[in-house]
Design a protein with these regions (language model features):
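Donor-binding and catalytic core of enzymes assembling or modifying cell-surface/extracellular glycoconjugates
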Residues: 113-200
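Secretory-pathway luminal glycosyltransferase catalytic domains
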Residues: 1-114, 121-127
Length: 201
C-alpha cells in the first residue's frame, strides 16, 4: 500500500508537525503542488496561513478552469475521507470514522443540486496496517454514497479536489483537516458550508 506525506490540511493547521526534512521531502515529491507553493511562499514572505493558501487556490482556479466540471459551481460537493479511517485501530482513525449514510441523507434531504464526491483512500506512516480491510470497506462505503445520492466521483489530485470543494455551490464537510481547509477557505470567501464536525478533526 502506497503511503503519502502529502497532508495539506495538516500543513496549514498544525505546521509544527513538519520539520525541515519533511518540508523538503514534500517539495521534492510534489514539486508543482499547492503544498510546495505554500512552503516556498511562506519562506519568502510570511502571510497568515489561510490567506496564503487561499490566494494559491484562487490563482490556480483562475488559470485552470478547463480542469473542472462545467457545472461545478451549481453542484454540491461531498468530501469523503477514505482509507485508514474506515477500519483503522488507532485513536485518531477511530475519531475520524465517516458519517453514517442515513445521517448524510437526512442532512442533505432538501439539497436538490447535482452531487459530486471528492476524496480517495489515504494512508500514512501512522496508519494501521489492516490495509486490505480498509480498502474493501472504503470501496463499499464510496459506492453506497454514490448510489444513495446519484453522485459522480471526481478522481483527481488532492489539489484539484480541493478546488472543486471551494468552487461548489455547496460543500458537505468530511473528516480531517483537508476537509476543514475547504470549509475555512469557503468561510473566508463567504460561501456556504454544511459543517458536520465540531471538535474532532
Amino acid at each position: 500500500m502506497e503511503l503519502s506525506n502529502y497532508r495539506l490540511g495538516d500543513l496549514i493547521f498544525i505546521p509544527g508537525l513538519f520539520d525541515n526534512k519533511l518540508l523538503h521531502k514534500i517539495i521534492n515529491d510534489y514539486p508543482d503542488s499547492f503544498a510546495t507553493k505554500y512552503i516556498i511562499n511562506q519562506s519568502k514572505k510570511y502571510e497568515d496561513n489561510l490567506t496564503a493558501i487561499t490566494n494559491i487556490v484562487l490563482d490556480f482556479i483562475k488559470n485552470n478552469k478547463h480542469l473542472f466540471p462545467d457545472d461545478i459551481q451549481e453542484s454540491t460537493v461531498i468530501h469523503l475521507r477514505l482509507g485508514d479511517v474506515i477500519a483503522g485501530n488507532t485513536w485518531h482513525e477511530k475519531q475520524k470514522r465517516p458519517l453514517d449514510i442515513n445521517d448524510m441523507k437526512d442532512i442533505l434531504k432538501n439539497d436538490m443540486n447535482k452531487k459530486y464526491v471528492i476524496g480517495k483512500q489515504f494512508y500514512c506512516d501512522t496508519s494501521s496496517i489492516n490495509y486490505n480491510e480498509c480498502n474493501l470497506l472504503s470501496i463499499k462505503y464510496l459506492n453506497e454514497v454514490l448510489v444513495s445520492f446519484n453522485a459522480f466521483h471526481l478522481e483527481n489530485t488532492a489539489d484539484i479536489d480541493l478546488c472543486c470543494g471551494v468552487m461548489a455551490k455547496q460543500f458537505f464537510q468530511g473528516r480531517g483537516y483537508f476537509s476543514k481547509l475547504i470549509v475555512e477557505i469557503r468561510k473566508k470567501l463567504n460561501l456556504p458550508v454544511i459543517e458536520t464536525l465540531t471538535t474532532i478533526e
